[in-house]
């Protein structure tokens, strides 16, 4: 392992991982550079990992991604990923606020579909606005939420997002992105939408739905993983698919997923979050 603590090399390695990680002046568990969790219910297997990108580690900054899941009742699962905007100033704090607000809201709702997805997004946006007041733009964050309902055929999924955090279906080694335009927007240099809604003038909210078959995985990713996944169809995509293949059996642990999320790849220095769901 390199002094910079990077995980596996997927593609050309990043030279930045050769530098030792400096000791941060201030660190608390809630702002850890490495986070991982997971578990199983009667209907779902869930694994999540979030790691600070090498750029943040070397500059002594926290991971500015956040994730959460909620299991309000049997057969229902909500999963959320947010990516705080580094240039905003307090993006990591905004991601934490958005995820926490949506998580709490979804634990109490009656319905479980597109309307609830959109309501959770609005609740998250309002929470970020209220926390930041006139400076709410400093808390800017992307946001993606998926509501999963167990069914005999697999699982029904409803999603909503703002920004470039995304969602994929993984079947064996095939990745299908559920929101259109990810790669095209990157090429055009499009302005990324964020919460709070309206802070950038035209933050488009997108929705999607899919039937997740048995054996497939729903994978939510921050752009620190989604971008290299799209750019590396012969490296990152098959390597991550191989890692995730151990999820349903229990062979993949949260710590092993965090190690994979910390892959070394030239030019990829952003924070990375992976949240994967398999119906049982």
What are these language model-derived features?
Residues 2-104, 165, 205-209, 269:
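N-terminal entry segment of metal-dependent catalytic domains or homologous docking segments
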Residues 110-172, 200-211, 277:
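Catalytic core of PPM/PP2C metal-dependent serine/threonine phosphatase domains
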């Amino acid at each position: 392992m390199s002094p910079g603590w990077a995980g596996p090399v997927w593609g050309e390695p990043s030279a930045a991982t050769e530098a030792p990680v400096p000791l941060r002046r201030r660190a608390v568990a809630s702002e850890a550079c490495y986070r991982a969790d997971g578990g199983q219910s009667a209907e779902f297997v869930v694994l999540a990992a979030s790691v600070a990108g090498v750029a943040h580690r070397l500059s002594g900054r926290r991971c500015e991604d956040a994730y959460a899941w909620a299991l309000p009742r049997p057969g229902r699962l909500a999963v959320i990923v947010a990516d705080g905007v580094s240039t905003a100033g307090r993006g990591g704090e905004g991601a934490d606020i958005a995820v926490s607000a949506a998580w709490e809201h979804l634990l109490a709702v009656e319905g479980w579909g597109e309307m609830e997805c959109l309501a959770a997004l609005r609740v998250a946006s309002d929470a970020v606005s209220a926390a930041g007041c006139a400076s709410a733009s400093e808390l800017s964050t992307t946001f993606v939420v998926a509501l999963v309902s167990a069914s005999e055929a697999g699982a029904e999924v409803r999603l909503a997002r703002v920004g470039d955090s995304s969602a994929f279906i993984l079947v064996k080694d095939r990745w299908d992105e559920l929101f259109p335009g990810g790669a095209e927007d990157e090429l055009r240099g499009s302005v990324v939408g964020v919460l709070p809604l309206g802070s950038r003038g035209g933050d488009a909210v997108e929705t999607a739905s899919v039937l997740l078959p048995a054996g497939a995985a729903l994978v939510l990713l921050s752009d620190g993983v989604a971008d290299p996944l799209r750019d590396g169809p012969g490296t990152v995509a098959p390597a991550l698919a191989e890692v995730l293949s151990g999820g349903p059996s229990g062979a993949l642990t949260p710590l092993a997923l965090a190690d994979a999320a910390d892959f070394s790849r030239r030019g990829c220095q952003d924070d990375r979050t992976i949240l994967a769901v398999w119906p049982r």
